Structures are given as C-alpha cells and as structure tokens.
C-alpha cells in the first residue's frame, strides 16, 4: 500500500520525485519505506516547501524507535504510521525536531510504559515552554522549544512532537 501510494504521488510530480528517489537509494530499506510513507501521504505543500533531509530525520527517528523499543514495535501499523512516524501535526512549519527531542527526553522515560512516559513528557514540555498569546503564524515544535513559549495550538504541536519523538502515539485534539 505504501509503495503504491508513493508511486502515484511520484507519477503526479516526476520532477520533484526524481531527486527524492535518488536519495532514497542511499537509505536503508526500512528508512526508505518510512520516507515513502511520509511522501505518499503528506500534502503537496510539504513536498514542495521542505527538503528531503527534513523528512529523513522523521523517518530515521521512527525506524529507530520501531527497532529499539518493544512497545513501539508492538503498536498496530496504522497507529505507528499515523501517530508516531508522521511528521505533520497541524498547520505548523515543519522542522527537524524528533531526534533532538528524543535525545533530550529519552533518559527521563527509560523503562516507563506509554502512560507513564506520556505524563513525564508532558512534565518536560511544561518545563520547556509556557503559554504566550500571539497572532503570528503557527511555529514549529523546535521553535516553541527554543523560544520557551507558544500559543495554545503551538504548545500542543510541541507536545505531540515530543511524545512522538519517544514513540508515544499522539495526535492533536481540540476540546471546548
């Protein structure tokens, strides 16, 4: 299914996908498949606006989690693909962050189940960023981290990326 959807996207944008295909040949089979999943299901705006290396970081982190964390490996494929591997959370700028966040958080959640890890990641996020009201464009997760604050939606994008960076399936949900 991933390969089929990737080839369909590539057929629609041959000049964009030719260099992507060249770079995929240099990846391991697992990382190439993860990248193909991202490209198969990402919006055209992401394909056109971000370099391959950004998505490679998400793919490499996801594959590493799948290989090294038994809890992640036990996830149903659809959950892993959509809520751990996938790069997009909302309409935020996409920037490399997952590998960095995993390095920052990993030791704090060592040996924890998903529930315990989710709580610890939430504490880490609260330590790193606070609420700040603005009307600016939605920042990337790494920008919120570096700035130390963000709007409500930015904080949730930050938290979802932090959770996904360590293999905890997460998505953004709005509730009144």
Regions found by a protein language model. Name each.
Residues 107, 117, 123, 132-142, ...:
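Hydrophobic/aromatic-rich core segments of domains that either
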Residues 1-122, 127, 134, 144, ...:
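N-terminal accessory/pre-domain segments preceding catalytic cores
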């Amino acid at each position: 299914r991933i390969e089929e959807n990737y080839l369909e996207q590539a057929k629609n944008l041959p000049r964009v996908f030719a260099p992507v295909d060249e770079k995929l040949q240099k990846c391991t089979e697992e990382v190439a498949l993860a990248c193909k999943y991202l490209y198969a299901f990402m919006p055209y705006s992401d394909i056109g606006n971000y370099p391959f290396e950004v998505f490679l970081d998400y793919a490499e982190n996801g594959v590493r989690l799948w290989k090294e964390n038994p809890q992640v490996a036990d996830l149903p494929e659809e959950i892993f693909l959509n809520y751990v591997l996938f790069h997009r959370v909302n309409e935020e700028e996409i920037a490399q962050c997952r590998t960095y966040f995993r390095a920052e958080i990993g030791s704090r959640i060592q040996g924890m189940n998903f529930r315990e890890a989710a709580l610890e990641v939430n504490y880490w996020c609260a330590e790193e960023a606070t609420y700040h009201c603005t009307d600016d464009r939605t920042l990337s997760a790494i920008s919120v981290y570096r700035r130390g604050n963000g709007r409500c939606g930015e904080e949730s994008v930050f938290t979802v990326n932090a959770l996904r960076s360590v293999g905890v399936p997460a998505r953004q949900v709005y509730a009144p």
